[in-house]
Amino acid sequence: GEKMVLVACGWRHTITVSSSGSLYTYGWSKYGQLGHGDFEDHLVPHKVEALKDSSTSQISGGWRHTMALTSDGKLYGWGWNKFGQVGAGDNADHCSPAQVNFPEEQKVAQVACGWRHTLAFTEKKNVFAWGRGTSGQLGHGEIVDRNTPVIIDALSPDGPGSKKLESSAAIPFAAKIWVSPSERYALVPDEKVAKPGDVSARGNGADASVPENDVKRMRVSS
């Protein structure tokens, strides 16, 4: 069999990528989160045929949805989509990969899933979020859901709010993002959790910060 070089887990499903860039999934698929075009569970890894002609470079699993980034910068999502966390512009579940559209100049470099929301980081160092947002976890200054990627202004060079962070001596982002699978999430510069006084992104509006022992981190390697 093929050697697996990447692995990510959702709640009850697993995603793996082989050394050749082929994508495999297995586990529970009630909401189509395996991406095989149906809602059938699989006990062993099955190749995602819809992406057989693409080389997968990054993967992430949400509670009931899955995201995959290909080597040419295309982002795909599938599975449970009640809150738009797949990013396909609708709220219907997807049992096959659906491409997530970004502005042409915003090539995706990283992706990470939360419980019911998703984050992406582009080569231009902009952060986009979509999915469940009623606890403020999308970082858009609103408590609404989004079914397409929306830039987080305050954390993105192309966002008008980024100047406010610069004036507060915010530290720059490194090449990795971490996401909690729950309502809380964090964008962590230099792989360090925000300290008191640092500017941090956070979910639940009652949280003053996201301390290390309060974040179950999911790592997306560059």
Residue ranges and their predicted role:
Residues 1-222:
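Eukaryote-biased RCC1-like beta-propeller repeat architecture
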